[in-house]
Curated annotation (Swiss-Prot):
It comes from Ehrlichia canis (strain Jake). It comes from the Bacteria. One of its GO terms (molecular function) is structural constituent of ribosome. Gene3D superfamilies: 3.30.1320.10. This is Small ribosomal subunit protein bS16.
Amino acid sequence: MSVKIRLARFGAKKRPFYRVVVADSRVSRDGKFIESLGFYNPMLPKEHELFVKVKVDRLKYWLSVGAQATDRVAWFIKKGIINIETV
């Protein structure tokens, strides 16, 4: 089973809201997931405290046991939007 950390889309039409989830790679984007790690709201400005909110300790755990972050989640980590050095 290949596990990925990815975004699952929620919200209404033209008002996207994403959850950062851990899911099996074979499951559909908005399908069943193992654990919800946080959320991402692209409708808010980047400076807003609720733009991205993630349980950093759980994110570090899943990365340590071999879960792969998708391109977008890896971009958040690389740019420092999700700061994994805080814990």
